[in-house]
């Protein structure tokens, strides 16, 4: 692929995802999720996935369909309350859920992208469930949990505008964890509403530099109905 021509097909973007892959998905309750890439991964039939995402989406929104169709073996997220299927699978033991407070989750992903081994945080230091099986250190007289950094085989993220080099801009709060995930995965693919020639995005507007992005696909749009509609 030419370095300045990263626009690819959706099928090409997901071609190397295999059973057992570790995937990051941007999105907050589906907002900022890459709908076309999620649908393609679902249609591909891959399973036993480890998914890192802010939340479990809704049954028909965001990463929800991957969970509903039992493609996810392990979910690392800050909450799952909006998707009752995820809660049911967790209590039945068919889905492993690793909860991480939202801010901690973001920083663990950021650490992964920065090449750090983890972060120190006092969030949950007095909660036995949060502290279980985690190391605690004392720095300047204060106790902290050591939270491991998070990385992935692939990050599938959503952008508003991409150029042909993979430089990305985002639409307001749809940005959420997408820029962090772009840096924390071995391979990153972005789904964008628009793909423009290189140079059309002002350098002041670029949030994710194209050096972090392997390929961009044009979004086919949201096919689900939002919860508030």
Swiss-Prot record:
What terms describe the molecular function in GO for this protein? CoA-transferase activity
Q: Does the keyword Transferase apply?
A: yes
InterPro entries per UniProt: 3-oxoacid_CoA-transf_A, CoA_trans_fam_I, CoA_transf_BS, NagB/RpiA_transferase-like
> Which residues are listed for CoA binding in this entry?
26-32
Q: Which UniProt keywords apply?
A: Transferase
The EC code for this enzyme is 2.8.3.-
Superkingdom is: Bacteria
Q: Which Pfam families match?
A: CoA_trans
Family statement drawn from the similarity comment of this UniProt entry: Belongs to the 3-oxoacid CoA-transferase subunit A family.
Summary of subunit composition and partner proteins: Heterodimer of a subunit alpha and a subunit beta.
NCBIfam families according to UniProt: pcaI_scoA_fam (TIGR02429)
- Protein's UniProt name: Probable coenzyme A transferase subunit alpha
> From what organism does this protein derive?
Bacillus subtilis (strain 168)
